[in-house]
Amino acid sequence: MALSDRLEMVNPSEIRKLFDLAQGIEGIISLGIGEPDFDTPEHIKEYAKEALDKGLTHYSPNIGILELREAVAEKFKKHNGIDADPKTQIMITVGTNQQILMGLATFLKDNEEVLIPSPMFVSYAPAVILAGGKPVEVPTYEENEFRLSVDELEKYVTPKTRALIINTPNNPTGAVLTKKDLEEIADFAVEHDLMILSDEVYEYFVYDGVKNYSIASLDGMFERTITMNGFSKTFAMTGWRLGFLAAPEWVVEKMVRFQMYNATCPVTFIQYAAAKALRDERSWQAVEEMRREYERRRNLVWKRLNEMGLPTVKPKGAFYIFPRIKDTGLSSKEFSELMIKEAKVVVVPGSAFGQAGEGYVRISYATAYEKLEEAMDRMEKVLKEKKLV
C-alpha cells in the first residue's frame, strides 16, 4: 500500500520518544510535559455538568456556538485590543493545535515558504509540511533573550515566502516579544505581503510586570493575522480540547470549511461551559493565582540552574525555561538521556525544537515547587559527580 509522501516527511515528536524512555523508571520527576499541573477550576467543571444535564450534547454549528464566540469577542476586545465580529471573524476549534494546519491551508500553495522563529513549538514545521509548504527556520539567540528580530527575518525571506508564525510568550524559550518588536515585525510583514499566524496560548503567564501584546491589534494587521488561542493553558483545560481564533472573514470561512469535513465541530457542552467561564470573575482569579505560582517556580529554577553552572536567560513568560548546556560537552539529546538515567529527571533536548535549539534543554516548571527543588538537587548532583560543570 502506498504511503502519503507528506506524512513520511513528518517524524514523531522527539518529546514523545523521551517520555517512552522514561516510562517505567521508578521515582522519575518529569519536567518535560507542556501542560499545567493545576486542575480545571471547579466552577468550570460545574458549568460543563450543567450543560450535560440540559441535554446540550448535539452538534453545534461548524464555526462554534454564537454564545461562546460572543464571549471570545468580548475577551479579545478587553484583553487584546482586537475588534472582531463574533458572527464572521471568530471561530471555535478542537484545541489550538488544529488551528495551525487549518489556518495555513486557507492560503498556502504548494512549495510556498513559511518563516518560523527557532527554537520553535514542535507542531509548526509539520503543519507547514502537511499543508504543502516549506518550513524555513529563522534563528533567535540567547543574547537577545530569544526574541525574534527583523534583521534575522530579512536574511531568510524570499519571493516564495508566504507567511510567518510567531509565538509569544514562547514555547520553548519563555521569550516575550515587546510592542516595539511586534511593530517592526508588522512592518516587515506588510513590506513582504505576508500572512501571520500568532500563537498566543500563554498570553496570561507573563512575569516581572511584562505585558503581552497581540500583533493583530496594531493598525492594519488584523486583515493579515490569524490570532490563535485556546483554553488549555489559560484555564488548565488541556484535556477538554477547545480553542478559539480571530481572523479576517475570508480566512474564517475557509477554516470553517476545513473543520466541517475534519472534526465537524468542537464538543458542544464544553463550548457552553467555556462561554460561562470567560464571563466568570472566578476564572480570572484562578488564572492570576496560577500566574503567581508559575512566577515563584520560575524564580527558583532560574536561580538554581545558574548556580549549578548552566547559564540561563530569565524567561519573561509561559512556563518553560531554556538553560544552555553547551559547556558540558554533551549534545542536548545526550544531556537529556543522562538526566533520565542518572538523575531520574526528564528534560527535553533543545534539538526537538529546531536547529537553533541545539545546545539547550527545555525545562517545564508546571510542576509542584517541592518536586522542582528535588529535581534541581538531583541534576546538580549528577553534573558535579560527572564533572560536567
From Swiss-Prot:
Superkingdom per UniProt: Archaea
A Gene Ontology molecular function term of the record: aromatic-amino-acid transaminase activity
Catalytic reaction(s) noted: an aromatic L-alpha-amino acid + 2-oxoglutarate = an aromatic oxo-acid + L-glutamate
Keywords: Aminotransferase, Pyridoxal phosphate, Transferase
Thermoactivity: Optimum temperature is 95-100 degrees Celsius.
Enzyme Commission code(s) on record: 2.6.1.57
Pfam families: Aminotran_1_2 (PF00155)
CDD domains recorded: AAT_like
Matching Gene3D superfamilies: Aspartate Aminotransferase, domain 1, Type I PLP-dependent aspartate aminotransferase-like (Major domain)
GO annotation, biological process: amino acid metabolic process; biosynthetic process
Sites of N6-(pyridoxal phosphate)lysine modification: 233
This protein's record includes keyword Transferase: yes
Cofactor(s) the protein needs: pyridoxal 5'-phosphate
Assembly and interaction partners: Homodimer.
Family under the similarity heading: Belongs to the class-I pyridoxal-phosphate-dependent aminotransferase family.
Function per UniProt: Catalyzes the transamination of phenylalanine, tyrosine and tryptophan. Shows virtually no activity towards aspartic acid, alanine, valine or isoleucine.
The protein, known as: Aromatic-amino-acid aminotransferase 2
Origin species: Thermococcus litoralis (strain ATCC 51850 / DSM 5473 / JCM 8560 / NS-C)
